[in-house]
From Swiss-Prot:
SMART domains: S1. It comes from the Bacteria. Belongs to the IF-1 family. The lineage of its organism: Bacteria, Bacillati, Bacillota, Bacilli, Lactobacillales. Pfam families: eIF-1a. Residues 1-72 form the S1-like domain. One of its GO terms (molecular function) is ribosome binding. The gene is infA. One of its GO terms (cellular component) is cytosol. This is Translation initiation factor IF-1. Component of the 30S ribosomal translation pre-initiation complex which assembles on the 30S ribosome in the order IF-2 and IF-3, IF-1 and N-formylmethionyl-tRNA(fMet); mRNA recruitment can occur at any time during PIC assembly. One of the essential components for the initiation of protein synthesis. Stabilizes the binding of IF-2 and IF-3 on the 30S subunit to which N-formylmethionyl-tRNA(fMet) subsequently binds. Helps modulate mRNA selection, yielding the 30S pre-initiation complex (PIC). Upon addition of the 50S ribosomal subunit IF-1, IF-2 and IF-3 are released leaving the mature 70S translation initiation complex.
Amino acid sequence: MAKEDMIEVEGTVVETLPNAMFKVELENGHQVLATVSGKIRMHYIRILPGDKVTVELSPYDLTRGRITYRFK
């Protein structure tokens, strides 16, 4: 899948789950299950509940996503 096909939305981390998974509440009120992208994992960027993040969603499954950026 091409990167242009991904849907980028902002949200807030609600809960941390095992295996680097997070429950993220999007700005529109929906909750998605998100994992950490490789670059964030590689640079040891910590993500905690309450952090504002950018999530990439696939148009095929809008319930799962990938965290690509954590706002400071």
